[in-house]
Amino acid sequence: MDTIFALASAPGKSGVAVLRISGSRAFHAGRVLAGGLPDAQRTSLRKLRDSDGSVIDEALVLAFESPNSFTGEDCVEFQTHGSPAIIAALMNELSALPGLRLAQPGEFTRRALENNRMDLAQVEGLADLIEAETEAQRKQALRTFSGELGQKVELWRKDLVRAMALLEVTIDFADEEVPEDVYPEVQELLGRVSQNLAAESAGTHAAERIRHGFEVAILGAPNVGKSSLLNRLAGREAAITSSIAGTTRDVVEVRLDLDGLPVTVLDTAGLRETQDEIEQIGISRAMARAESADLRIILIEDGRLPSGLGVADDDILVQAKSDILPSSSEFAISSVTGRGIDRLVKAVSHRLSLRAASAGTATHVRHRLAISSAVESLDLAKTKISEGFPVELVIEDLRQALVDLESLIGRVGVEQVLDEIFANFCLGK
């Protein structure tokens, strides 16, 4: 297998740059450039030289001996000054060495997966950690990256393997008396796994929302102050405001960090009866996005709801323009003076935080589908046991459930998703 190298830090000028080398010839490459290497898991300050002996830079050099490295292979890292010229010179020297090539996106992590340094869920957690923009995203990604889902899968797997082994006993003793009735223990094991999977499945929606962001739609009649509220929340002129009704015709989105939660606030077209075909399209889009939103803020000006809009239990009704229309409403705001905005934001954050609290460790659609498939197989197995089906058919259902669970951590049937996952990594990962 080729030895690979890449810049592990962000490209461009910086105080420090990190260049990573991994593979069987990593130590040789390190010695060629640095004149020698420190002991494994140690660091030393060395001059890096080109093939003519000229100094390229003075850098911290680290060596990691297989399997105690990120990839599980021999690895060398150079921590250099973050000059593009220095990195280009080092890349040129490494490219000229036999058996070395530039890494593909995510190739270091792919090797870590292949060498069992991490499972597939941890790989996804690492990708999410790199992309995390808010505190909630960081915490969730770190849980996945730390292997929490893999630990759960291993517990579920042990219970299923135990249940299958017990059932196999009844086949082995088909013509003899089975030493003991195994079905009570089998049913207990399957019940426990089913209960755990149901709990994990219940938290997938919240976990996915944390990854992608919650959506909060602002609804109301034209000129009620929806765009003004969006601009106040964004702290900038994200949407055009005008006294002309129907100014907003498409959905305007603003990404916010509300108490660590990723939230996309949607400014929508004013809801009213209109003959304007373009405005009608905008209103239809507004209603569609509002239906799929996690939370709706409904602005009212005269105490009346916009035509055709029903109110859900979790909607937040807000009296707008409180600077000119005094109100005793729980949520009365003025986007001009800022009155009531903090109270509204806290209410939104609180309601979304309650939903986020139910998030599990299964954070991707792939995880949810695999768990759902495993639950379906377990339900079939339990039904067949209760109806007296042949044991072989029950075992086959349990085996399918096991395959579904093992796909969560990349043991089986995930080759088709690897390229998509690793394509989103940078070269140095």
From Swiss-Prot:
Where does it live in the cell? Cytoplasm
Q: Which cofactor does it need?
A: K(+)
Question: What Pfam families does the annotation carry?
Answer: MMR_HSR1, MnmE_helical, TrmE_N
Any idea which positions bind GTP? 223-228, 242-248, 267-270
Q: Give the EC number(s) listed in the UniProt record.
A: 3.6.-.-
Q: Where does (6S)-5-formyl-5,6,7,8-tetrahydrofolate bind?
A: 20, 77, 117, 429
Q: Which domain of life is it from?
A: Bacteria
**Residue intervals of the TrmE-type G domain:** 213-353
Q: How is the cofactor bound?
A: Binds 1 potassium ion per subunit.
**Which terms does the UniProt entry file under GO BP?**
tRNA methylation; tRNA wobble uridine modification
Instruction: Identify the keywords attached in UniProt to this record, alphabetized.
Output: Cytoplasm, GTP-binding, Hydrolase, Magnesium, Metal-binding, Nucleotide-binding, Potassium, tRNA processing
Entry binding sites for K(+):
223, 242, 244, 247
- Binding residues for Mg(2+): 227, 248
Enzyme class, spelled out: hydrolase
Recorded GO CC terms? cytoplasm
One GO MF term attached to the UniProt entry: GTP binding
**What is this protein's function per UniProt?**
Exhibits a very high intrinsic GTPase hydrolysis rate. Involved in the addition of a carboxymethylaminomethyl (cmnm) group at the wobble position (U34) of certain tRNAs, forming tRNA-cmnm(5)s(2)U34.
Query: What family classification does the UniProt entry report for this protein?
Result: Belongs to the TRAFAC class TrmE-Era-EngA-EngB-Septin-like GTPase superfamily. TrmE GTPase family.
Q: How does it assemble?
A: Homodimer. Heterotetramer of two MnmE and two MnmG subunits.
List the HAMAP family hit by this protein, alphabetically: GTPase_MnmE
Entry protein name: tRNA modification GTPase MnmE
